Amino acid sequence: MKKYILLIIATIFTIGLFAQNKSTVTTIIEGDGYTYIKNIRKSRLVDLYNQENKYTNVPLVYKETGERPPFDLREKRVEDDNWTSRHSELIVNRAFTNEQKQIVRGHKLGVAIYIDSTTGKVVETEFTFPEMTPMAEIPLSVFRKIELDMKNEIYFTLTDVGKMYNYVFFYWMQEIE
C-alpha cells in the first residue's frame, strides 16, 4: 500500500512539474498611457505586444468563410516595393539611441507587423527576442516608438489575394544598426 501511495505522489509531482515548465509566464507592463503584454515562453523567447492588439494570437483566415488558408510562401499578398521594407527597417533602427545600439549589437529583434487587409496600413506590431539577451533590457518606450512610427508611416498596396484575409502578416529578424 505504501508503494502505491508513493507512486501516486510521485506521479502528481511529475505532472505538476511538467505543467509548470510548459506554461507561458505573462507580465503586464505599464507605459505612459499604454500597456504592453510580455509573454515569456518555455523556450525563454519573449513576445512583446500592445495590450490593445486584436490580431495577436488570432489565426489568419479568409474574411468570407472564416477558414484558414493553406500555407503558401509564394502567395503575393502585397505589391512589391523596395521602399516599404527599407523604411520599416529604418523605423526600427532609428528608435534605438546610439548607446542602445551598442548594447544590443550582435543580437536580433523579431518584428511582426499586422496589416489591415482593407486599407494596407499597419495596425499592430509585435516583437520577439530571447529573454537572456540585452534586447530584454531596452526600455518599453523604444518598442512603443517603433509601433507608433510603423502605424503612422508604413502602408502597403494590397493584392486581391491580400484583401481576402482578415489581416496580412509580415515578420522579419533585424540586427539593430
What are the residue ranges of the model-derived segments?
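Bacterial Sec-dependent N-terminal signal peptides
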Residues: M1-T27
